[in-house]
């Protein structure tokens, strides 16, 4: 083990003697296993050299995570981030005052009464998708969940119906899939363009921008714009504190951000929820009884526990832009990324008793602790968290009301990286019988 001291007074957490090339291979092939190995050897903070992210400090200590998320202007968003592929107008790419202004503008339509108005839309999409499910025959749930969350977000964000909805439904999934891969791969040399996901994403994004530009123009000219409840219409009606509106480019990039951040992650969490519930029939019995009685507390706790035990996002990170950042006993120099390992933190027995046990009751009657981070933390906490939670809650409520979820004795499904999100390796297989 080597604990390096850099020029000045910078002191980094322990690093590994594993060569950088092997570190990179471990991070690419199985990042979570690699981080677990380093955590078991070096503790809750260690230094690595990662592909794409470069020199990075990985932490899994709740107190240090709180320090990081309240570090203010000493840090910016982790580099690189999804803003690299979504565009400079995406909230992922914005910093400082511009980020705060955009967040203030977009928070109202994604919280409270506006999102409750979408609940029936979720019910309708769940029932339309599940109407053709086979009875008693096992199938992977992740693709149906993807279709449900895609349809919901396209209708809620764009107000799309009919041919517009069909066109977006064809266009968005391949764009999100290749974008997830591009986010984890640096741009390749020109010679390798045919296999470069960044190049493929650029083509898909150009098609998206051209089509969505037309939808924005159409919405702006809609004589009923003031009556519309979709997020595109709300963006067009909204202004910053200085009275200026969002530009068309900003709107297009922010809509793409919502699709990228809110579609795949929500669907993947739902697939994990179904995977977990099949292996815990006692939890399902409690959930069904609660649904039949019109309650929701145990279901909400179950969603929190799914997100704790099966976080779909690897980390919440920041990039040090000050001369250095003091974090616990460490002094991290400018240019480093600091990554909070969500999976490691959620498995910390000092934060969550018996973390290996799937136990929704740990969240009954209490708010999640600060160590619970499926949506990230600080000023960059997922702005769509309330929308995603509503969508997961209504989806599970509807499925449990309509179907009996058949239990299984099969082994738990393993993690599988889909690029940005970690999904069940067999797609969250389920079997159902109509109630």
Predicted regions mapped to residue ranges:
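Conserved cytochrome P450 K-helix/beta-meander segment immediately N-terminal to the heme-binding cysteine loop
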Residues: 340-366
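Cytochrome P450 proximal C-terminal region
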Residues: 4, 8, 39-40, 126, ...
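Cytochrome P450 heme-thiolate monooxygenase catalytic core
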Residues: 2-12, 76-83, 98, 114-268
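N-terminal membrane-proximal hinge/A-helix region immediately C-terminal to the signal-anchor transmembrane segment
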Residues: 1-95, 101, 116, 123-128, ...
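Cytochrome P450 catalytic-core helices
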Residues: 263-290, 385-403
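Conserved cytochrome P450 K-helix E-x-x-R motif and the immediately C-terminal K′/meander segment
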Residues: 24-43, 293-328, 349
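Cytochrome P450 I-helix active-site segment
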Residues: 11-18, 119, 123, 170-174, ...
């Amino acid at each position: 083990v080597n604990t390096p001291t850099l020029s000045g007074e910078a002191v980094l957490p322990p690093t590994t003697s594993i060569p950088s090339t092997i570190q990179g291979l471990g991070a690419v092939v199985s990042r979570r296993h690699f981080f677990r190995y380093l955590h078991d050897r070096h503790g809750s903070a260690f230094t690595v050299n990662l592909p794409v992210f470069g020199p990075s400090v990985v932490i899994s200590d709740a107190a240090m995570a709180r320090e990081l998320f309240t570090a203010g202007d000493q840090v910016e968003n982790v580099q690189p981030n999804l803003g690299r592929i979504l565009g400079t107008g995406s909230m992922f790419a914005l910093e400082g005052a511009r980020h705060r202004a955009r967040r203030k503008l977009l928070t109202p339509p994604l919280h409270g009464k506006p999102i409750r108005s979408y609940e029936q839309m979720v019910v309708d999409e769940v029932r339309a998708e599940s109407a053709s499910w086979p009875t008693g025959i096992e199938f992977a749930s992740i693709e149906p969940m993807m279709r449900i969350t895609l349809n919901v977000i396209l209708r809620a964000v764009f107000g799309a119906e009919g041919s517009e909805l069909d066109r977006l439904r064809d266009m968005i999934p391949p764009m999100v899939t290749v974008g997830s891969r591009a986010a984890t791969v640096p741009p390749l040399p020109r010679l390798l363009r045919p296999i470069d996901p960044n190049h493929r994403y650029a083509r898909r994004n150009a098609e998206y921008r051209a089509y969505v530009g037309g939808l924005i123009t159409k919405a702006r000219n809609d004589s009923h714009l003031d009556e519309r409840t979709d997020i595109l219409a709300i963006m067009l009606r909204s202004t910053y504190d200085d009275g200026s509106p969002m530009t068309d480019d900003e709107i297009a990039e922010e809509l793409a951000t919502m699709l990228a951040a809110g579609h795949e992650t929500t669907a993947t969490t739902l697939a994990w929820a179904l995977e977990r519930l099949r292996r815990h029939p006692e939890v399902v019995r409690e959930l069904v009884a609660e649904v039949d009685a019109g309650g929701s507390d145990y279901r909400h706790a179950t969603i929190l526990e799914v997100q704790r035990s099966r976080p779909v996002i690897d980390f919440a990170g920041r990039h040090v832009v000050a001369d250095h950042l003091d974090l616990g006993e460490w002094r991290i120099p400018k240019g480093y990324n600091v990554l909070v390992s969500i999976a490691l933190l959620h498995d910390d027995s000092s934060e969550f008793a018996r973390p290996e046990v799937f136990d929704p009751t740990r969240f009954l009657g209490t708010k999640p602790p600060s160590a619970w981070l499926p949506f990230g933390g600080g000023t960059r906490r997922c702005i769509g968290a309330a929308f995603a939670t509503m969508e997961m809650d209504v989806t599970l409520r509807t499925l449990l009301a309509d179907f009996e979820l058949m239990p299984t004795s099969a082994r738990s499904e393993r993690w599988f990286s889909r690029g940005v999100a970690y999904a069940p390796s067999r797609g969250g297989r389920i079997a159902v019988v109509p109630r």
